């Protein structure tokens, strides 16, 4: 009996141990994050970040600690074979799964001084195109998730609260950038004549290039973000650089580690290197003068850190805007970078400003083509003005160009022109002379563009690319216009039109998508605006307009494999030549809310407008039907009809109130869609209730309701 009892007890212990282990493993899934009612939170707490829309969640910190304790170190066998999994809360109420690993952004010497500062890198499971960087700091948990659906951010609900959090879309973040100014000036690089502009292929991802970052902080910055302490300010710097690294790793395979003695250049009150406690009066920086701080930073970093001990230098402040010197890392001017903002927190500070100013240091110029407000004053770069208005990528000026703003904040990608410049500097320029390279095992995707085409003016068109990836990574596509203002002379009118005869860029970039097709202009403007996008959407420039003149537009597609640890990218180029004497090619019927019957013939008409003649030579068209308002066109009504302006087609046996017709050139990329929904409804009349009373017997006819009347309704044998 004792032996049996002992065996049962041992078995029970093993069972309980296994159950406990299983519970611990499942806790991050079930209990790490819980939605919470904001009304239960402290309404008087000081908040740094208040988006217009957000979800509040509560973090189980003990469960998070369990999850983080299972994280393997990056670039280890364990990271490949036994990745840890974490769930992150999304703004829409869902939870998203990620594989994650520990990924330090501090050199070991600094990490040893601040062991509670932990940073991680993650790759999406539910959405493999999503990558993330998150941290666990004394100030709480912070995350950035980069995905085609949009950037998601997770931040503490309030200062000092490490339990309650907000998760929100970047597009819903408040605009905190109105006081910022970047004082970088175009170094007046030699320009190419418009006909000589070329688009070299850009590839990256086989090597992760790691650089040592000396990141100084003025006393004013440490007071603003870190309670005037070195630890508090460094935590804020780690948060910012973790997010910056997330973008640089995915787009450029560049990683920056904060140097071992960075605490010595963080000029908080408990840093005693200023002849005592550091203050705004005795630290080595002129906080509100960015240009002056460029030289001060070089002197300070070389003296305190040593020129041989860092590869790129930068300083954070609360004034002076942003300014940097082109092509700095590994060179003598490597410390010449400044980012200053009165409220130096949040994603806008990290991406719109720090990533932007460091982008200059890595070799990228401004990419906006606007000329008013901050886009004026010599800030526009003649050699790289590839985006309408303020632009919207990292090296543009989203949110600070007044009437020419494209959006309140940038999207978290670099324009292909910026990719070219940074890849060239870091891979084959001076920036390649001091990098620590790590083989990633990643092979960039191979992307194929559609080729070159000739189209009529004022007519929608689509470009489609395809890509393969030998590693099986999930690919996204980003079609961008690659045209400078003619001769780089600057804008002479609203910067997203060519109707004045100037062949400037007229299509803005968007967040990369999972599909390889981009339609110009975006489909809503075709369906709702008769192919003419409004000049503004809300308070911002629309940034899309069909060409109105003879010109050749160049487009590049960037294929990304979205590897979180070192993204692979590749590009392809297509030229679209516009014939100003032809077009618009346009559907003319059905263009009203008509109603047609299924299985009947309908005459589709369109304006040919010179599209059959050389050099367009579109002899035939394809005619398709949509039943969902023009979003998809699965039904082909005519695969190859003569491009003569009219074709009788058979309406299929379907019913809908949201039908549209699409007529597209066979062997070309241009098309048009009918302007208005029309209906396909059956013409067979449906019996109406008004016929019922005629069959109802009158009171005097009651006997006719007896069973003797039943046989009249019975079918004969």
For each predicted feature, which ranges?
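Proline/serine/threonine-rich low-complexity linkers at boundaries of modular beta-sandwich domains
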Residues: 429-446, 576-584
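Fold-level signature of zinc-dependent metallopeptidase catalytic domains
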Residues: 26-33, 37, 164-324
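Extracellular acidic, Ser/Thr/Pro-rich low-complexity tracts
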Residues: 466-471, 483, 561, 607-614
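N-terminal prosegments of processed precursors
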Residues: 23-158
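Short, solvent-exposed loop/turn segments at the edges of extracellular beta-sandwich modules
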Residues: 560-567, 666-670
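Ser/Thr-rich, Proline-interspersed low-complexity disordered segments
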Residues: 684-716
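Exoplasmic/lumenal beta-rich domain surfaces
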Residues: 257, 476-549, 615, 622-647
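The catalytic-center signature of Zn2+-dependent metalloproteases
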Residues: 259-289, 329-410, 480, 484-496
């Amino acid at each position: 009996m004792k032996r049996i009892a002992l065996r049962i007890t041992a078995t029970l212990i093993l069972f309980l141990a296994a159950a406990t282990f299983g519970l611990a493993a499942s806790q991050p899934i079930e209990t790490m994050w819980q939605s919470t009612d904001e009304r239960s939170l402290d309404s008087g707490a000081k908040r740094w970040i208040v988006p217009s829309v957000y979800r509040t969640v509560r973090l189980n910190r003990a469960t998070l600690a369990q999850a983080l304790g299972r994280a393997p170190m990056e670039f280890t066998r364990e990271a490949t074979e036994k990745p840890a999994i974490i769930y992150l809360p999304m703004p829409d109420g869902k939870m998203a799964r990620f594989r994650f690993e520990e990924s330090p952004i501090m050199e070991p010497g600094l990490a040893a001084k601040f062991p509670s500062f932990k940073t991680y890198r993650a790759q999406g499971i539910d959405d493999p195109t999503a990558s993330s960087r998150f941290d666990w700091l004394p100030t709480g948990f912070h995350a950035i998730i980069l995905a085609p659906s949009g950037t998601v951010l997770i931040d503490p609900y309030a200062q000092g609260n490490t339990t309650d959090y907000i998760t929100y879309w970047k597009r819903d973040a408040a605009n905190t950038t109105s006081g910022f100014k970047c004082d970088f000036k175009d170094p007046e690089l030699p320009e190419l004549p418009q006909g000589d502009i070329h688009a070299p292929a850009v590839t990256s991802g086989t090597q992760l290039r790691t650089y040592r970052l000396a990141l100084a902080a003025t006393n004013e910055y440490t007071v603003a973000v870190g309670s005037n302490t070195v630890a508090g300010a460094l935590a804020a710097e780690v948060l910012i650089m973790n997010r910056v690294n997330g973008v640089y790793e995915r787009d450029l395979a560049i990683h920056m580690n904060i140097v071992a003695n960075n605490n010595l250049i963080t000029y908080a009150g408990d840093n005693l290197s200023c002849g005592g406690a550091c203050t705004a009066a005795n630290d080595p920086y002129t906080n509100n003068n960015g240009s002056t701080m460029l030289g001060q930073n070089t002197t300070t970093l070389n003296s305190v850190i040593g020129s041989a001990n860092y590869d790129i230098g930068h300083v954070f402040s609360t004034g002076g805007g942003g300014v940097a010197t082109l092509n700095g890392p590994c060179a003598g001017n490597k410390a010449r970078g400044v980012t200053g903002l009165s409220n130096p927190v949040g994603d806008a500070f990290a991406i719109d400003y720090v990533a932007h100013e460091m982008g200059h240091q890595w070799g990228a110029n401004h990419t906006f083509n606007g000329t008013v407000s901050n886009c004026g004053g010599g800030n526009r770069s003649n050699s790289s003005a590839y985006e309408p208005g303020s632009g919207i990528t990292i090296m543009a000026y989203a949110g600070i160009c007044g009437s020419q703003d494209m959006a309140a904040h940038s999207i978290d990608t670099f324009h292909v022109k910026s990719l070219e410049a940074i890849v060239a500097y870091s891979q084959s320029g001076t920036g390649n002379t001091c990098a620590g390279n790590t083989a990633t095992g990643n092979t960039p995707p191979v992307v194929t563009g559609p080729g070159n085409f000739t189209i009529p003016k004022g007519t929608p068109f689509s470009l489609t690319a395809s890509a393969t990836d030998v590693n099986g990574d999930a690919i996204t596509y980003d079609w961008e216009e690659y045209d400078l203002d003619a001769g780089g002379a600057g804008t002479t009118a609203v910067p997203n039109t060519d109707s004045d005869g100037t062949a400037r860029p007229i299509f803005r970039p968007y967040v990369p998508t999972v599909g390889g097709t981009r339609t110009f202009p975006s489909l809503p403007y075709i369906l709702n605006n008769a192919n003419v996008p409004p000049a503004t959407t809300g308070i911002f420039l629309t940034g899309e307009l069909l060409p109105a003149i003879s010109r050749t537009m160049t487009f590049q597609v960037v294929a990304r494999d979205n590897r979180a640890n070192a993204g692979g990218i590749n590009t392809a180029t297509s030229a679209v030549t516009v014939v100003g004497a032809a077009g618009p090619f346009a559907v003319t019927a059905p263009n009203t809310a008509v109603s047609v019957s299924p299985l009947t013939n309908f005459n589709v008409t369109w304006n040919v407008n010179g599209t059959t003649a050389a050099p367009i030579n579109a002899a035939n068209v394809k005619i398709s039907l949509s039943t969902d308002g023009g979003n998809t066109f699965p039904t082909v009504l005519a695969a190859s009809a003569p491009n003569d302006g009219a074709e009788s087609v058979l309406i299929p046996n379907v019913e809908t109130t949201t039908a549209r017709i699409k007529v597209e050139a066979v062997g070309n990329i241009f098309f048009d869609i009918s302007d208005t929904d029309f209906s396909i409804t059956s013409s067979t009349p449906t019996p109406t209730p008004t016929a019922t009373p005629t069959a109802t017997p009158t009171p005097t006819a009651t006997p006719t309701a007896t069973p003797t009347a039943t046989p009249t309704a019975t079918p004969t044998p």
